[in-house]
UniProtKB/Swiss-Prot annotation:
<dbReference type="InterPro" id="IPR044140">
    <property type="entry name" value="ProRS_anticodon_short"/>
</dbReference>
<dbReference type="GO" id="GO:0006433">
    <property type="term" value="P:prolyl-tRNA aminoacylation"/>
</dbReference>
<dbReference type="InterPro" id="IPR002316">
    <property type="entry name" value="Pro-tRNA-ligase_IIa"/>
</dbReference>
<keyword id="KW-0067">ATP-binding</keyword>
<keyword id="KW-0436">Ligase</keyword>
<dbReference type="InterPro" id="IPR033730">
    <property type="entry name" value="ProRS_core_prok"/>
</dbReference>
<dbReference type="GO" id="GO:0005829">
    <property type="term" value="C:cytosol"/>
</dbReference>
<dbReference type="InterPro" id="IPR002314">
    <property type="entry name" value="aa-tRNA-synt_IIb"/>
</dbReference>
<comment type="function">
    <text>Catalyzes the attachment of proline to tRNA(Pro) in a two-step reaction: proline is first activated by ATP to form Pro-AMP and then transferred to the acceptor end of tRNA(Pro).</text>
</comment>
<dbReference type="InterPro" id="IPR006195">
    <property type="entry name" value="aa-tRNA-synth_II"/>
</dbReference>
<dbReference type="InterPro" id="IPR050062">
    <property type="entry name" value="Pro-tRNA_synthetase"/>
</dbReference>
<keyword id="KW-0648">Protein biosynthesis</keyword>
<dbReference type="Pfam" id="PF03129">
    <property type="entry name" value="HGTP_anticodon"/>
</dbReference>
<dbReference type="InterPro" id="IPR004154">
    <property type="entry name" value="Anticodon-bd"/>
</dbReference>
<dbReference type="InterPro" id="IPR004500">
    <property type="entry name" value="Pro-tRNA-synth_IIa_bac-type"/>
</dbReference>
<dbReference type="InterPro" id="IPR045864">
    <property type="entry name" value="aa-tRNA-synth_II/BPL/LPL"/>
</dbReference>
<protein>
    <recommendedName>
        <fullName>Proline--tRNA ligase</fullName>
        <ecNumber>6.1.1.15</ecNumber>
    </recommendedName>
</protein>
Length: 440
C-alpha cells in the first residue's frame, strides 16, 4: 500500500475525548473513527489488525476441531423468553420490533441461538461431543461507553460453545478450549493469565477470565509470580491427550491467580511474600462451564447410550476480538506510538523514501516495496519531511522500518529499524529483507 493513496488519517494532536493510551493511539494512528457514542468505523489499517487477530483465533479453533458458524445479530425474543432471560436481561440489551410488531433483539450473547441450532440437528450421544464458534458483531447498550473500543457498545466477539454427553466430557472440552486460548494469546504476542472469575449473567459454576496485565486495566488482579515463568505456548501439551490436559490444567490452576471479585486473601497471603504480585488487568477472554442450564431451558435432548433422553452439558467460550486490539496497544506502546507484535501488525514494514524524486532512492524504494510485498509493506511515498515520516512510522507501530536515503541508495544499502527495540542497523537490501522474513 502506498501511503500517499491510503486511508490512514494520522493525527498530530491527541483527541480530547481519549482518556487511555489505546484510544488515543487508535485515533491518532488512523485505525478507527468514532461514529456515535461507543460505536466506531474501522478504517483499513485497523481492519487489517482485526482480521489478523480473527484469523489466528480461527486457526487455533480449527486445531481443536471447532466448527465455524455465523449466527444472526438480530434474534427472536421468543427464544429468549423460552430460556427465561428476555425479561431478566438488563437495559444493556437492545430491544426492537419489526413491522409486524414482533419482538426482536440485537444479540448481546448467543447461548439461546446455538442451543436452538443444536437441538434441531443433534439427536444422539453418537454425535457428541460438538464444538462450534462464530466471530460476529454484538451490541450492548453500555450506560457509559468509554475508552474507545475497550468498552464500546458495538464490538466483535468470538463466541464458542461445547456440547457434551456428561460432566467429564464437558470438563475435557473446557480444558481443551483453555489450552487453545493460551496458544492463541501467545501467537497474538501477549501474556494472558487465566484467573478464577465470576460467571455473571451467563451463569454456571466454573469460570476463568484471561487477563492481560496493563496499568489501565479495569480490574485489580492478584497472582503468583510463577506465572511469569510458564511456557504460554502450551507447545508441550497435546489437546487430544487426557493426561496432557490434566497436566496442563494443574500447571495453570496450581498457582494462585484471581480478579478482585474472586480474590481469596488468605490463599494469596499463604504465598511466600516474594512471589505475591498485584496489578491491573484487562479481560480479553472468558470461559464458562454451565452444565445443563440452557439445554434444559430450551429442552435440547439427545438419546443416551441406554436410549433414555438426556440434556447435554454445555460450555461457553469468548474472546473479545475488537477489545484485543486495544488491549495489545495498552500492553505494548511507548511515547512515540504503538508497538505491534509481528503476528497482528497491519503491515510488516514501512518503507521510508527520504528523498522522493531522487532516481536512485525512488528505484530502491520501489524495489524494496515490491519484494516485501505490496500487501505487507506500507510505502511512505509522500512528499514530506523525513521527521514527519519517522514520526508517523513510529506512531503506526510497524515492526520494521526500511529507511532509504541518497547516500545509502548510492551504496546499495538501507537502514533497518526494529520498532520494538529501537535498534538501527545498516544492511544490504538482501540482508534487510531476510531479517524481515525471519520475523514472520
Amino acid at each position: 500500500m502506498r501511503l500517499s493513496r491510503a486511508l490512514i488519517p494520522t493525527l498530530k494532536e491527541t483527541p480530547a475525548e481519549a482518556q487511555i493510551a489505546s484510544h488515543r493511539l487508535m485515533l491518532r494512528a488512523g485505525l478507527i473513527q468514532q461514529e456515535a457514542a461507543g460505536i466506531y468505523a474501522w478504517l483499513p489499517a485497523g481492519l487489517r489488525v482485526l482480521n489478523a487477530i480473527a484469523n489466528i483465533v480461527r486457526d487455533e479453533q480449527a486445531g481443536i476441531g471447532a466448527q465455524e458458524v455465523l449466527m444472526p445479530t438480530i434474534q427472536s425474543a421468543d427464544l429468549w423468553r423460552e430460556s427465561g432471560r428476555y425479561d431478566a436481561y438488563g437495559p444493556e440489551m437492545l430491544r426492537l420490533k419489526d413491522r409486524h410488531e414482533r419482538d426482536l433483539l440485537y444479540g448481546p450473547t448467543n447461548e439461546e441461538v446455538i442451543t436452538d441450532i443444536y437441538r434441531h440437528s443433534v439427536k444422539s450421544y453418537r454425535e457428541l461431543p460438538q464444538m462450534a464458534y462464530q466471530i460476529q458483531w454484538k451490541f450492548r447498550d453500555e450506560i457509559r461507553p468509554r475508552f474507545g473500543v475497550m468498552r464500546g457498545r458495538e464490538f466483535l466477539m468470538k463466541d464458542g460453545y461445547s456440547f457434551d454427553l456428561d460432566y467429564a466430557g464437558a470438563v475435557r472440552s473446557y480444558r481443551r478450549i483453555m489450552l487453545s486460548y493460551m496458544r492463541t494469546f501467545q501467537r497474538l504476542g501477549v501474556k494472558a493469565i487465566p484467573m478464577l472469575a465470576d460467571t455473571g449473567p451467563i451463569g454456571g459454576d466454573l469460570s476463568h477470565e484471561f487477563i492481560i496485565l496493563a496499568p489501565t486495566g479495569e480490574s485489580e488482579v492478584f497472582y503468583d509470580a510463577a506465572f511469569e515463568e510458564i511456557d504460554w505456548s502450551g507447545a508441550s501439551f497435546n489437546v487430544d491427550s487426557d493426561a496432557d490436559l490434566e497436566r496442563f490444567f494443574q500447571t495453570i490452576t496450581g498457582h494462585y491467580a484471581a480478579t478482585d471479585e474472586k480474590h481469596d486473601t488468605a490463599a494469596y497471603e499463604a504465598l511466600p511474600e516474594a512471589r505475591r504480585r498485584t496489578g491491573r488487568g484487562i479481560e480479553v477472554g472468558h470461559i464458562f462451564y454451565f452444565g445443563t442450564k440452557y439445554s434444559k431451558a430450551l429442552n435440547m435432548t439427545v438419546a443416551g447410550r441406554d436410549g433414555q433422553k438426556l440434556h447435554p452439558e454445555m460450555g461457553s467460550y469468548g474472546i473479545g476480538v475488537s477489545r484485543m486490539v486495544a488491549a495489545v496497544i495498552e500492553a505494548s506502546h511507548d511515547e512515540a506510538g504503538i508497538i505491534w507484535p509481528d503476528s497482528i501488525a497491519p503491515f510488516r514494514a514501512a518503507v521510508l523514501n527520504l528523498k522522493n524524486g531522487d532516481a536512485a532512492c525512488d528505484a530502491m524504494a520501489e524495489d524494496v516495496y515490491r519484494r516485501i510485498g505490496v500487501r505487507h509493506a506500507l510505502y511512505d511515498d509522500r512528499d514530506e519531511r523525513a521527521g514527519v515520516k519517522f514520526a508517523d512510522a513510529d506512531l503506526m507501530g510497524h515492526p520494521w522500518q526500511v529507511v532509504i536515503g541518497p547516500r545509502g541508495a548510492a551504496a546499495g544499502r538501507v537502514e533497518l529499524k526494529r520498532r520494538r527495540t529501537g535498534e538501527r542497523v545498516e544492511l544490504t537490501v538482501e540482508d534487510a529483507l531476510a531479517r524481515i522474513r525471519e520475523s514472520v
